[in-house]
Amino acid sequence: MNIIFWGTPIFCVPILEKLLKSNHNVLAVITQPDRRRGRGNKVLPSPIKQKALEENLPIYTPVNITKEKDIQAKIKQYNADIFVVVAFGQILPKSVLKLPKYGCWNIHASLLPRWRGAAPIQWSILSGDSETGVGLMAMEEGLDTGAVLLEKKLKLKLLENAEQLSQRLKDLSCNLIIEGIEILEKVREQSQSLSKLNLTKQEDINRTYSYARLLMKEDYLINWNDSGYNIHKQILGLYPNCYTYINSKRLKVLESIPINNKYDEFLDFRYKDIILKSQSIINNNGLIIDIIENIGIIVQTKDVPLLITKVKLEGKKESSQNALIQQLTLTNSQNKLGE
């Protein structure tokens, strides 16, 4: 198959690599323009553009593909069999969708129609989903509304953060796209139309529709008056950027465990007394209620106490266990987070 690949973030890179190592031909790459990013706020290419440069592939970077007819004309000249689209970052217009002979196919990191939109991985964790996956969808003009050709599922792990889940979904996606292209090749070989494909309309899938909206700055700030379970999901889902304050310094919270029997296998200490202590504290959420050597600190929340095992204090390196304890107790005379 002759393919044009559309994508932008790091999530896409292994999928492009998989296609490049296959017996298929990647003709060109379309990605978002260079943008300011990183600590130095320098103008940098997208991860996909970096990979395409390494492979000497033709690259196009439309600001708005709908309006840029010159780029559309250049793409048309490739006469591609299919477009593979993974987190490109723009909605493709009908004039682009109709170009490839065997369709535009989007890999989406959720089990559609659940978590259509920009941040499906984060929202699956934030919402406490037990299962997620990836789907290969026939693209249409709507946002993630197309019929599904294939999907692969996985179970979320209790302490799995967004970075770890993303890696597992990348691996699934690499297998998914090769399987999907094999199906499309059979259609081509048999001179059949795409109407012969066994596609499932999303309205026929027995799942609740939900929208994975873009994340905002305020989503990353921990509210210690919230449930400990919700805070834990926030830390996992927004890894590694969830934060609080300690003596007016920003503190990223990287790892946590709710102190509850559901997480018993991860708690290497007796915690019943801590739960009793927590239950006796009223209206003091964010308080560090205990410090356990070689493990971490325990923080009061609305319901269950939360064990914090790894942090990054503003201007410091990541710290865990005793280094975390020393850093926070020296910084925080009031023994409280969120202030």
Curated annotation (Swiss-Prot):
Swiss-Prot/TrEMBL keywords: Protein biosynthesis, Transferase
GO molecular-function terms, A-Z: methionyl-tRNA formyltransferase activity
SUPFAM superfamilies documented for this protein: FMT C-terminal domain-like, Formyltransferase
Cellular component per GO, a single term: cytosol
Isomerase as UniProt keyword: no
Residues spanning the signal sequence: none
Reactions mediated catalytically: L-methionyl-tRNA(fMet) + (6R)-10-formyltetrahydrofolate = N-formyl-L-methionyl-tRNA(fMet) + (6S)-5,6,7,8-tetrahydrofolate + H(+)
EC number(s) recorded for this UniProt protein: 2.1.2.9
Domain of life: Bacteria
Cited Pfam families: Formyl_trans_C, Formyl_trans_N
Gene3D superfamilies named among the record's database cross-references: 3.40.50.12230
Sites where the protein binds (6S)-5,6,7,8-tetrahydrofolate: S110, L111, L112, P113
Family annotation (HAMAP family): Formyl_trans
Physiological role: Attaches a formyl group to the free amino group of methionyl-tRNA(fMet). The formyl group appears to play a dual role in the initiator identity of N-formylmethionyl-tRNA by promoting its recognition by IF2 and preventing the misappropriation of this tRNA by the elongation apparatus.
Protein family (similarity comment): Belongs to the Fmt family.
The protein's name: Methionyl-tRNA formyltransferase
Native source species: Prochlorococcus marinus (strain SARG / CCMP1375 / SS120)
Gene name tied to this protein: fmt
